[in-house]
Design a protein with these regions (language model features):
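Gram-negative bacterial Sec-dependent N-terminal signal peptides
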Residues: 1-20
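Internal, conserved structured core segments that host functional sites
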Residues: 135-162
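Repeated loop/turn-to-beta-strand initiation elements of outer-membrane beta-barrel proteins
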Residues: 82-88, 143-146, 211-214, 263-269
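Transmembrane beta-barrel strands of outer-membrane/channel proteins
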Residues: 34-42, 88-94, 150-158, 205, ...
Length: 317
């Protein structure tokens, strides 16, 4: 089913442009542009745990926050003909970046709105994050000073975190928030990875006035496949959790503004907002201490949103 959806969205621009006259494909310098930029990545990713036996209520949530991680971003686009373009783009962090993680549990079913256990981990690292994007565009309007087109593509993104040390407030069986303490500094507490795979559709356009140019791109997917891996390193509770969620929604808006310093070279700034909305999925766990495993349907939730700002150079060959 996923392959069928991907085939549909990837052929959409070709179908739209079928009214156009056939052009001979030619790999010439006039058909290619490339850009490179530097910037920052900020955002938050969330993992949730639900109990099906208690009506699917949320019993745990971990929020991983990161700010101003340095990234490098690049793209290349090839105009196959006046109505069709193909492109590849991607970005990656240039190193790890400090962040923060908060882990909360709601274990009292008689008072589900009040957390019973919480740990905070200010010594958290975004180890890495990256993304690649392959796309095709069908131009409905393609004039020297403005363009408007539909697009479709495939995109993957990855995030990796490690939380160390920190403090906790737990509730004992007899009390409420009565167990207070801290973890050893530098000791690994939790490692977490997320991965998002998605075919998408979108709308893109640009407008140029003299040497100034403004561009906007909107992307949407209802077919996101998300997966994660959560490693709890506590020797007394050494557990691995793995979750998968299908058919999540993804939204992205990108706005850029640039100035042509030469007929072929443009400097620009760009801001991109991305979000994958939360949805329940299946989860499994493996207890390394007693070698047991378990599986829960609709026992997990995965969510991510981030904002990217960059400044760079685009060159048309």
């Amino acid at each position: 089913m996923r392959a069928k959806l991907l085939g549909i969205v990837l052929t959409t621009p070709i179908a739209i442009s079928s009214f156009a006259s056939t052009e001979t494909l030619s790999f010439t310098p006039d058909n290619i542009n490339a850009d490179i930029s530097l910037g920052t990545l900020s955002g938050k990713t969330k993992e949730r745990v639900y109990l099906a036996e208690e009506g699917g209520r949320k019993v745990s949530q971990l929020d991983w926050k990161f700010n101003n991680a340095a990234i490098i971003k690049g793209a290349i686009n090839w105009d196959l003909m006046p109505q069709i373009s193909i492109g590849a783009a991607g970005w990656t962090t240039l190193g790890s970046r400090g962040g923060n993680m908060v882990d909360q549990d709601w274990m009292d079913s008689s008072n589900p709105g009040t957390w019973t256990d919480e740990s905070r981990h200010p010594d958290t690292q975004l180890n890495y994050a990256n993304e690649f994007d392959l796309n095709i565009k069908g131009w409905l309007l393609n004039e020297p000073n403005y363009r408007l087109g539909l697009m479709a593509g495939y995109q993957e993104s990855r995030y990796s975190f490690t939380a160390r040390g920190g403090s906790y407030i737990y509730s004992s069986e007899e009390g409420f928030r009565d167990d207070i303490g801290s973890f050893p500094n530098g000791e690994r507490a939790i490692g977490y990875k997320q991965r998002f795979k998605m075919p998408y559709i979108g709308l893109t356009g640009s407008y140029r006035y003299e040497d100034f140019e403004l561009g906007v791109t909107f992307k949407y997917s209802g077919w996101v496949e998300a997966s994660d891996n959560d490693e709890h390193y506590d020797p007394g509770k050494r557990i691995t959790y793995r979750s998968k969620v299908k058919d999540q929604n993804y939204y992205s808006v990108s706005v850029n503004a640039g100035y042509y310093v030469t007929p072929n070279a443009k400097v620009y700034v760009e801001g991109t907002w991305n979000r994958v909305t939360n949805k329940k999925g299946n989860t499994s766990l493996y207890d390394h201490n007693d070698n047991t495993s378990d599986y829960s349907k609709n026992g997990a939730g995965i969510e991510n949103y981030n904002f990217i700002t960059t400044a760079g150079l685009k060159y048309t060959f």
